[in-house]
Amino acid sequence: MSDTFFTDAPHWTWWILLYFFVGGIAGTAFMLVSLLDWSATGSRQLPARPIVRLGYYMSFIGVLISGFLLTVDLNRPLRFWHMLIQNHTGQPMFKAWVPMSVGSWGLMVFGLFTFLAALSVLGEDRPGLRLLQSSPVRALRRPVPRTIIAVLGSIAGLFLAGYTGVLLAVTNRPVWADSYLLGLLFLVSGASTGAAALILLALRRQADRGTVGWLVWFDRNVLILELLVLIAFLISLGSVARVYLSWWGLLLLIGVIGVGILWPLFKERGGAHAPRQLMQSASLVLFGGFLLRMVVLFSSEQIHVIGSGVTGR
C-alpha cells in the first residue's frame, strides 16, 4: 500500500474546488484569445476582436474571483497578504520551496497581465472615456507592449492552470501524490473548459463564425488529448487506482468521461456548428471539467485507513 494512505487530509473545501475550476478557465482563456488575436491578421482581425476583448475581460474577472476564493478558504482570510509581504519589514516574501507561496505570486503576476490586457482593450469598447485614451493606456495598444503582455500573460496563465494540479501532487495524499501527470491533466482540462467558456460567450454575442469555428476546432482536439491524458493518469496510479472502484469511479466514468468528454465529441462530429448544439456541447465540457476536479479533490480527501484496510467516507 502506498504510504500516501497513512497521511491526514488537508480538508480543503468547496472554495478550493471553485478556485481550481475558475483559475483554470481564466488562465487558458487568456492564452487562447492572445493566440486568436495573434493569428487573426488582415481581414480576419476585425471580426475576432470582440472575442479577444471578452476573453481578456473574462480572465481579469476570473483572477479576481480566484483571489477571493483562495483568501476565503484560509482560516484567517485577513492575513492573506502575509503570503506576499513580510509582516515586519514590508518587503516581498517569496518562498520558492513553498507551493502556496509560488501559487500566490503566480496568481498576482497573472492578475497584473490580465489587468493590463483588459485595460488596453477597454478603450475599444469605451472610446469616449478620456482616461482610456491617455498616453499610458494608448501605449499598451502598441504592437510591442501588446505582444509582451500577451506572451508573458499567456505563460502566467498556463502556469496558473497547471499549478492547481501540481499543488495537489506535492501534497502527500492518495491519488494526488501517486502520479506525475496531475499537473498536465489539470492544464489540458483547463484548456478545454477555457475554450468552452469562450465558445459560450462568442455564441451569446453572435460572434464571427470563423472565430467560433476556430474555438470549436481547438476544443475538439484538446478534448481528445484530455481523454488520453486522463487514461494515462489512471494507469500511472497503479494499484492506487482501486480507489476509484467506488461511486467516485462511477462519477468519473459517467460524468467526466461520458458526459464531459465523449458526448461533446459525439455531438460535434462531422463539424456541425449549429449554435444550439455548440452551446450544449460547451456546457457539457464545463460540467465535465468541474466534475473532474471534484472527483480528484474529494475522492482523496475522503480516504482514511482503518487498521490495514482503506475506507472512503
Task: Give short role names for the model-derived ranges.
Residues 25-85, 89-106, 113:
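Membrane helical hairpin/interfacial module
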Residues 13, 20-25, 40-41, 47, ...:
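Long, contiguous internal "core" modules enriched in hydrophobic/ aromatic residues
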Residues 6-7, 20, 57-58:
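Compositionally biased, intrinsically disordered low-complexity regions enriched in proline and serine
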Residues 280-302:
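Final/C-terminal transmembrane alpha-helix of multipass membrane proteins
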Residues 1-17, 45, 74-100, 165-183, ...:
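Membrane-interface interhelical loops and short amphipathic "cap" helices
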Residues 29, 33, 78, 126, ...:
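Short helix-terminus and kink motifs of transmembrane alpha helices
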